Amino acid sequence: SIIKTGYAVHISRMSGSGRYLFVIGRDAKINMIDLWMEKPDNVAEIRVGLEARSVETSKYKGFEDKYAIAGSYWPPQYVIMNGDTLEPLKVVGTRGMTVDKQEYHPEPRVASIVASHFKPEFVVNVKETGQTLLVDYSNIDALKVTTIGTARFLHDGGLDSTKRYFMVA
């Protein structure tokens, strides 16, 4: 059967448990599909903006599927959600300075997001500013974000086969 999702699905990610498939359309609509149901279907959905490209779930031991995260092009932000319901818990803007010329950029888009298997962190790539953010979700009420300067306009990324290294182009 066909499961209705957002417009032009850009990426799909499996949850840490393998039970859920998260998809995000270019219209920023996230669908959480339960693959263990007799007939897989949507169990939660949310729209996190007007345009988006990336969704992921927490993978670190003890935090498997506890959180989901999505990054949007517009507005320039990422949203951390409850992994069971997609209820928004934190909305964090990405506006800021570029790494090379230290110029303010008002609309830096979140391109790719992956979840570390070694730490309670999301790796968030911010395209126009040339920043990769390590978002520590171990204390959702007091997020710790480490910013790594990279090249500007890096777009799509993922983990290598060991799941230790983030590669982005």
Question: What kind of region is each of these model predictions?
Answer:
Residues S1-A169:
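Predominantly soluble domains enriched in secretory-pathway, periplasmic, or organellar proteins
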